[in-house]
Amino acid sequence: MDANMNKILKWSIQNSTNASSDQNAAADATSRGLTPEMMATLFGGPSDADLMKASMEALRSDEVDLENKLVAFDNFEQLIESIDNANNLEPLGLWTPLVELLRHEEADMRRMAAWCVGTAVQNNEKAQDKLVVLNALPTLVAMSTSDPNPAARKKAVYALSSAVRNYQPAMDEVAKHLPEGYPRGEKIDAADMDAVDGIMDKLRAHPVESSA
């Protein structure tokens, strides 16, 4: 893992775990009219783009244990709640590695990857289109109907729900890959929230064979 990225990741983790001790300082700075961006510049903190790249480096590193990878994933998810950061996934080259993590051997990693995908594409047509281009929707459908981990399945449905709403190309792609018993041969209106909710509710209740 790149040394600079490692330092940034440590900075991010320390700031997320020590947030309570820094509240007074942050409040003082805010009361003086300093924005978070100005504070980052003044105190030399890394940019959101730096933190996003550092998190992904950690997620792909063999030197980072699962516990710290989940911390990095949590930080990553919070960062991409901002639509500007979500739209930076593409120029930063982070979409492809994020989608690849949907197939990770660790259930918690798959769960967090799906969660991040769902957060990034919510009410974001640019990101919704990226899922279609990357052919990630069939993976999410398979994950929502066959992943042995219930929490991972739940987040996969969340990602699908965010991906298809009000974006017809994603809805059409998902419809092609739904299992038998779903409305695969008919047009589903991505703007029809009742229709979308019906499919998502059915996916949440989809029976999964026990791996035992």
UniProtKB/Swiss-Prot annotation:
Keywords: Cytoplasm, Repeat, Translation regulation. One of its GO terms (cellular component) is endoplasmic reticulum. It is found in: Cytoplasm. Pfam families: Fes1, HEAT_EZ. The keyword DNA damage does not apply. One of its GO terms (molecular function) is adenyl-nucleotide exchange factor activity. Its main location: cytoplasm. SUPFAM superfamilies: ARM repeat. One of its GO terms (biological process) is regulation of translation. It comes from the Eukaryota. ARM repeats lie at residues 23-64, 83-122, 125-165. Functions as a nucleotide exchange factor (NEF) for Hsp70 chaperones which accelerates the release of ADP. Required for fully efficient Hsp70-mediated folding of proteins. PANTHER family: HSP70-BINDING PROTEIN 1 (PTHR19316:SF18), PROTEIN FOLDING REGULATOR (PTHR19316). Belongs to the FES1 family. This is Hsp70 nucleotide exchange factor fes1.
